[in-house]
């Protein structure tokens, strides 16, 4: 059964209070009714999850004083005023001061219910976004899971339902869509939050190194093993292990990883000692591991072991209504970081936000917002410098090519492998073009 939406009702008229409470309860609300403002203020928490409906004319503390006090507690708390005909001018002023709505007595039940329903939805979104921002801050993550589109609502609901379980999770999504953010949130919202969150990009390490990184090794296990090393899996025991780009994991390592998932134990290199581990594994892939034609050498049994729960993150182009909200958040954060004011949006920036396909997804949008705040004209693709009069076609193509490379580097956080993949050119060609255009790829990475 769904949880009833809470509403606080304050009215000193016993009969009207009872009738109003009954109307709201029949409409599916959970009503906390009070006979005065003092009782309500003593009982209501600052983060009350629903709207407040109050009469204006009450002894001791009237509805307008109550509204002002509640605004001081939480400026986003929706307050609906019930008012007699003579109080309408005061109610209008309260609306201008931030009250959610006023309803003139006598009122139809539907009028009250619809107003409370809209206010409840607004309150739910406000509290939900606060929770997500806090989760992102706690995780020290630069790409929070922000959005109000239905697909993001559904994603958050899934995360809430599974976060506090120990089920292993497979996260699917394009580059820059926020897969590690999802993993961080699963960790922060779980009972493992006090344990370590350990991340490893399987595509960033050569086959000769990845086993030692994951499982650890004893001194002398191989040439160069001067001392004992604790692996990422053991370090994550008690917390969460995040394996990004798991589709890049070597076949031999996949076999060992399957045993970790099944037995929750490891055997470090150079020893026969079996060590138990207690961890949750969140794996991420940018390809469809469920498609045999796509997954290639990735083991089917490992896929099915990870596929207890699969979370798909939609690309930014499929939730375009979230772009203004995300851009606003990233611009505000960049302004604080760079000690700049958020500039007004120019027509070029508005056009770019509306028309760009965002192949780098949320990460690309974040970098674009930073460039806008820094005053780079237009912030990106819209900011290509005017071509000098009389520039030849080859000169224009050279400038355009350089801009595409810069944008792709930015969208991929300076990661060479992902940038080459996105551009579809050989590695040597890529480095030749960097040198020819004088582009320093190090300047495009947000990692310090």
UniProtKB/Swiss-Prot annotation:
One of the protein's GO biological processes: regulation of DNA-templated transcription
Full protein name: C4-dicarboxylate transport transcriptional regulatory protein DctD
Source organism per UniProt: Rhizobium leguminosarum
Major subcellular site: cytoplasm
InterPro entries: AAA+_ATPase, CheY-like_superfamily, Homeodomain-like_sf, HTH_Fis, P-loop_NTPase, Sig_transdc_resp-reg_receiver, Sigma_54_int, Sigma_54_int_dom_ATP-bd_1
Residue span of region Inter-domain linker: 332-345
Sigma-54 factor interaction domain mapped to chain residues: 145-374
Binding site for ATP: 173-180, 236-245
UniProt modified residues of type 4-aspartylphosphate: 55
Single annotated GO MF: ATP hydrolysis activity
Entry keyword annotation includes Transcription regulation: yes
Job description of the protein: Member of the two-component regulatory system DctB/DctD involved in the transport of C4-dicarboxylates. When activated by DctB acts in conjunction with sigma-54 to activate the transcription of dctA.
GO annotation, cellular component aspect: cytoplasm
All residue ranges annotated as the Response regulatory domain in the record: 6-120
DNA-binding residue intervals: 416-435
Subcellular location: Cytoplasm
Modified how: Phosphorylated by DctB.
Keywords from the named record: Activator, ATP-binding, Cytoplasm, DNA-binding, Nucleotide-binding, Phosphoprotein, Transcription, Transcription regulation, Two-component regulatory system
PROSITE patterns according to UniProt: RESPONSE_REGULATORY (PS50110), SIGMA54_INTERACT_1 (PS00675), SIGMA54_INTERACT_2 (PS00676), SIGMA54_INTERACT_3 (PS00688), SIGMA54_INTERACT_4 (PS50045)
